[in-house]
Amino acid sequence: DEYKQKAKELIKHHFDHIRTFTKDLFTLFEEKVVLAQGELISTGMMNLYLNECGINSVLIPALDYMRTDKNAEPDPVYIKEKLIKLLDGHKDADLFITQGYICRNAYGEIDNLQRGGSDYSASLIGAAIGAEEIQIWTDIDGMHNNDPRIVEKTSPVRHLHFEEAAELAYFGAKILHPTCILPAKLNNIPVRLLNTMQPEAPGTMISNMTEKGKIKAVAAKDNITSIKIKSGRMLLATGFLRKVFEIFENYQTPIDMVTTSEVGVSVTIDNRKHLEEIVDDLKKYGTVTVDEDMVIVCVVGDLEWDNVGFEARIVQAMKDVPVRMISYGGSNYNVCLLYTSPSPRD
């Protein structure tokens, strides 16, 4: 009854706080505060439950140590300093509980990490404390060699290099956000992806090790837009590519693939929010052609240039598909192909 009463008081406290926002203008600040309440309530409830079970758990509020800088990027120095100090204050604890996703910004306001959610929090925490391993539990047995929502009878990939995992995450593997890999990679901490529904399954281990000369997986990214700028007059001029890329930067639109020729530049994007404005600005430099509903297929593995034959095998596998662009060389871990299709399943 004691813990049940504490849980009721916890929920009431947070709901009363949310109700205060109904009396004033609802701004972006209030929205972020409301979004944080789920993490705050669930972790508080879990901590009470564990205490009731006799486990000496301690709740460490993420809002006391997780902070972003003025560029909305995590501040690893601040996070490490504050978190270690908080942990040192509870040396007798059996278990620590904290929130994912939420943080404070550089001005002390409640905010969130925006990308990667709780997985990003786990990676940042693991890096801050120098963990032996970071575990991320999901509803699937690690990263698969194909998207199980599209391809039947896929199988988990047991080992991936940090770069391979980042490529798969960026090009369609929904199990992990590419941002989550970086803190672990910078601190050389292995990341293990495990399945909550099958805790005995080995999952996927992500580290700085790779299996040489092996293709690991294929990912697909749909709803891609291809933009081609054709300009024989401007292409060889100094600074032409910089000017083209600056247009995309001005509209905060990331580029997925780039290819160049003597008379043109082709790029792909997956964010069409500012497509019209981007095209208008690009027309200053040449003729612009836009193709929508494209798909990027990304083949990931140890694809260094001295591993002869991989590129030919990949292209041969796509012999019946009209490939529009091929990107290879920017990374030793992927080959990307662009083609027209209504869906990656096709």
Spans of model-derived segments:
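Intrinsic, low-complexity N-terminal interaction/targeting segments
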Residues: 212-219, 242, 276-320, 325-327
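A generic structural motif
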Residues: 263-270, 296-297, 333-338
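Conserved small/polar residues in nucleotide/adenosyl-binding loops
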Residues: 339-346
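Nucleotide/pyrophosphate-binding catalytic subdomain
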Residues: 1-176, 181, 333
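A glycine- and small/hydrophobic-rich beta-loop-beta segment
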Residues: 191, 197-290
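Conserved glycine-bearing catalytic or ligand-binding loops at nucleotide- and phosphate-handling centers
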Residues: 173-178, 183-187, 191-201
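Short, hydrophobic beta-strand segments
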Residues: 225-231, 294-303, 335
